[in-house]
């Protein structure tokens, strides 16, 4: 379950931000996660609760904003929106697609004290 490692990295990023911005508590974390990022949201929520225990983000609300995926279609030479990684091109039905959006996870913002 790599979501635990993701949560540990998230905690490290929050601790660095706390030092740089001089805050001591995180009450809410908003993450943008692409559909193709390979993150299982429920596993992430579980990991978040476990990893944040005893930290500056213990009890913080985790808000997940799911971002659509997109891909470049080699057949019609268009960037198209996709709901899942194995979908065919919605414009031409082609299957030669390379994901180019919705593959990452970003911290959108933190609510802090």
Swiss-Prot record:
Keyword set, alphabetical order: Metal-binding, Nickel, Zinc
Binding-site residues for Ni(2+), renumbered to this chain: 2
Entry keyword annotation includes Zinc: yes
Entry keyword annotation includes Metal-binding: yes
Entry's Gene Ontology molecular function annotations: nickel cation binding; zinc ion binding
Superkingdom of source: Bacteria
Residues engaged in binding Zn(2+): 73, 76, 89, 92
One of the GO BP terms on file: protein modification process
Any matching Pfam family: HypA
InterPro entries: HypA/HybF (IPR000688)
HAMAP family: HypA_HybF
Family: Belongs to the HypA/HybF family.
Protein task: Involved in the maturation of [NiFe] hydrogenases. Required for nickel insertion into the metal center of the hydrogenase.
NCBIfam families named among the record's database cross-references: hypA (TIGR00100)
Name this protein carries in UniProt: Hydrogenase maturation factor HypA
Gene: hypA
């Amino acid at each position: 379950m790599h979501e635990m490692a993701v949560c540990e990295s998230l905690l490290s990023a929050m601790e660095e931000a706390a030092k740089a911005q001089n805050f001591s508590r995180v009450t809410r974390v908003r993450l943008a996660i692409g559909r193709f990022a390979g993150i299982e949201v429920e596993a992430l929520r579980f990991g978040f609760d476990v990893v944040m225990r005893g930290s500056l983000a213990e009890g913080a609300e985790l808000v997940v904003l799911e971002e659509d995926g997109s891909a470049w279609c080699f057949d019609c030479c268009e960037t198209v929106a996709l709901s899942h990684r194995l979908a065919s091109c919605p414009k031409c039905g082609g299957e030669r697609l390379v994901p180019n959006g919705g593959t990452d996870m970003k911290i959108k913002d933190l609510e802090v004290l």
